[in-house]
């Protein structure tokens, strides 16, 4: 991990207002409550504010979702426009759960262009940007038969082939690695594959807390903030239940509205 710049260290001493933007899909949705609670506790007296664009099946440049509800593409949901107008001292961006777009038939180059646009706009604010790569190594982790089963269940109607998916994943991951090498404010978090469950896509229920602890600790390390406590299995399960509540009561049946931080 690169050494944090002095500007962040000196700013942290003055108890700044820190704005976090979290963008992703199902893994982020499950861990969102856990992640925000943990970061808030680590930053203590500093004012923290969160905005998010998340949800199962969500894409960055394609509309996606599950069952009877869909989400707009993250690039079109206005989270960046709102974040730009916020008055804050430090902006932190997390872009994770990349890959749904490919399964919806979006070409790798199109997804890369979308991600590059999001990252470029965040860099204009001098944001600290954290990325996670697509952690599936298709040829090693998923057989063609299992790929067909997963595609049929999560992405019915998708026409992408096993070979195309493998090629696209390699290309997108290559872009993410190069982006992190080229920009001192862009950080690529690796090693997330070790937290996945049987489908090799989603974090295991028993390891969700560990996955988000790793990501939160990387963010705290860059911002020079000490980690106050470890995440527990019970915290992860509680966050998953909170996500299930949002899915059922807010997204599926719309009995309740989500908070203003949801895009």
Question: Residues of each region from the PLM?
Answer:
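Conserved SGNH/GDSL esterase-like catalytic core that processes O-acyl groups on lipids
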Residues: 19-109
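Hydrophobic anchor at the start of a short beta-strand
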Residues: 48, 127-129, 186-187
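Active-site segments of SGNH/GDSL-like serine hydrolases
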Residues: 95-103, 121-165, 192-195
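Charged helix-capping and loop-helix junction motifs
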Residues: 108-117
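Acidic carboxylate-rich catalytic motifs and surrounding loops in phosphoryl-/glycosyl-chemistry enzymes
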Residues: 133-136, 186-201, 230-233
């Amino acid at each position: 991990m690169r050494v944090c710049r002095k500007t962040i260290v000196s700013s942290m001493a003055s108890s700044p207002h820190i704005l976090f933007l979290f963008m992703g899909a199902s893994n982020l949705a499950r861990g969102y409550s856990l992640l925000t609670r943990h970061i808030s506790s680590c930053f203590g007296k500093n004012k923290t504010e969160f905005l998010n664009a998340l949800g199962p099946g969500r894409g960055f440049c394609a509309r996606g979702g599950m069952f009877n509800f869909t989400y707009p593409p993250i690039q079109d949901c206005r989270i960046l426009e709102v974040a730009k107008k916020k008055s804050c001292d430090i902006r932190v961006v997390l872009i994770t759960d990349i890959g749904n777009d490919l399964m919806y038939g979006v070409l790798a180059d199109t997804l890369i262009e979308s991600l590059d646009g999001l990252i470029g706009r965040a860099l204009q604010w001098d944001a600290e940007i954290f990325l996670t790569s697509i952690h599936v190594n298709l040829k090693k982790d998923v057989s063609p038969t299992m790929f067909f089963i997963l595609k049929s269940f999560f992405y019915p109607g998708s026409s992408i082939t096993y070979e195309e998916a493998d090629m696209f994943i390699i290309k997108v991951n290559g872009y993410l690695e190069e982006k992190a090498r080229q920009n001192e404010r862009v950080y690529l978090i690796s090693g997330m594959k070790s937290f996945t469950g049987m489908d090799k896509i989603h974090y295991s229920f028993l390891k969700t807390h560990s996955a988000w602890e790793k990501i939160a600790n990387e963010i705290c390390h860059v911002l020079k903030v000490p980690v106050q406590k470890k995440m527990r299995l019970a915290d992860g399960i509680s966050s998953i239940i909170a996500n299930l509540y949002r899915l059922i009561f807010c997204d599926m049946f719309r009995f309740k509205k989500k908070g203003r931080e949801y895009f």
